[in-house]
Amino acid sequence: MAHEHNHNTEAIGDKRLIAAIGVNTVLTLAQVVGGILSGSLSLIADALHNLSDAASLVIALIARKIGRKPPDAFKTFGYRRSETIAALINLVTLIIVGLYLIYEAIGRFFAPQPIEGWTVVVVAGIALIVDVVTALLTYTMSKNSMNIKAAFLHNVSDALASVGVIIAGTLILLYDWYWTDTVLTLMIAGYVLWQGFST
């Protein structure tokens, strides 16, 4: 009976992860489109950060499934080491994304362009809602898995980044401060790198 309960709990956890992956992937595409249409680099930066969140959730799901396999003749310690490998892959992804964002932001300093503030605010607002929902989906599972905890923390940090993008979009609307978009991009990139190196 306990085994059946554990199996049902794991199945519910997998479904939550799949749902979180789905909404993060759709959100990433929406942010990229919104960033291109509005000219906002910080929105694209947030999209790339969101993409790393989706990747971490995919890795967490795969690690959960592999981790449930018992030891065999080839894997004497079982498959649970897959979580450690998954966490390492996620770390490398964060660092690559962070460096790319810095490169793009520096280029924007030398070639600034106008940005459509309303598009930035609306898309980032939707992103914030999705980030909060995704974080709630993974919160309970994060207590029992370092890999899912990492994915949960990524969603929380992405929600904070979305708040920053909303603020930048508002400043662009009110004062035409286009430079706030570039500065925020550097801040997001810096945080992504710090998050990667401190994991």
Show where each model-derived region lies.
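Alpha-helical transmembrane segments and adjacent TM-loop junctions that form the membrane-embedded core
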Residues: 2-19, 42, 48, 56-199
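The first (N-terminal) embedded transmembrane alpha-helix
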Residues: 20-30
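Short, hydrophobic transmembrane alpha-helix segments
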Residues: 33-44
